[in-house]
């Protein structure tokens, strides 16, 4: 069987993205046919910063229609509008290739959200762009690994805004889309308030979550969704034995336990999208960029998910 062709966007070049591309190419090319969306000149510069430890001529790289950012010992690890613009154009090109079926999927390396903002990119990050590009699809951010996957009902929104987002109709739509995308038989749903609201004692949000769970199970015809569970104990070992699939109302409630348990191996998956997209479950790691310290396990798992 022919290997799948995967477009890999470079992420912010001042971080660990190019380092991961170079150090992982041999393993990645054994899994798929990688197409690196970055100019060859930048790969050469990155290799020089890594003391020419890697072979760059064997990499299939596609030049990006954007000004080349500076990349040297004085720019690495720093936020740059030019690097932000370049990482966005790399990502956008990946989506275009996936839309036209020129690649089978895309893997995105980490971007810096402040760099995107400085470059006046009107999106918070990758997932926000996908939600705008594919408005007819309910794009769901799911992070994790085979041992634990967490779907986020809300992702990059202020915590104070989450309460108003928790409405029965919207949550039912989300839960059904999550189940359809994952084919999970059991999904544990975390509550929003302490003790999952204590039957209405602490806020009304958990009552709405319960109604959404009941309606979703009724639609499916079986008891798929369990909860709302008190979030402080939802990820205890005995709970994780029930199912690897969870839903969290907010970003940190779901991702704090995930990253405490499986930080190095977790990935980010965009569910319910018309294209296949995964990403590493870590940021640009500016503090260790170009020091040969970047762990590539998350990156390789993101590729394996697509391949």
Swiss-Prot record:
Its EC number is 1.1.1.262. It catalyses: 4-(phosphooxy)-L-threonine + NAD(+) = 3-amino-2-oxopropyl phosphate + CO2 + NADH. A divalent metal cation binds at residues 156, 195, 251. Pathway: Cofactor biosynthesis; pyridoxine 5'-phosphate biosynthesis; pyridoxine 5'-phosphate from D-erythrose 4-phosphate: step 4/5. It is found in: Cytoplasm. Substrate binds at residues 126-127, 259, 268, 277. InterPro entries: PdxA_epsilonprot, PdxA_fam. GO terms for biological process: pyridoxal phosphate biosynthetic process; pyridoxine biosynthetic process. Disulfide bonds: none annotated. It is an enzyme of class 1 (oxidoreductase). It holds the Pfam family PdxA. One of its GO terms (cellular component) is cytoplasm. Coiled coil: none annotated. Homodimer. The active site is located at the dimer interface. Catalyzes the NAD(P)-dependent oxidation of 4-(phosphooxy)-L-threonine (HTP) into 2-amino-3-oxo-4-(phosphooxy)butyric acid which spontaneously decarboxylates to form 3-amino-2-oxopropyl phosphate (AHAP). This is 4-hydroxythreonine-4-phosphate dehydrogenase. The gene is pdxA.
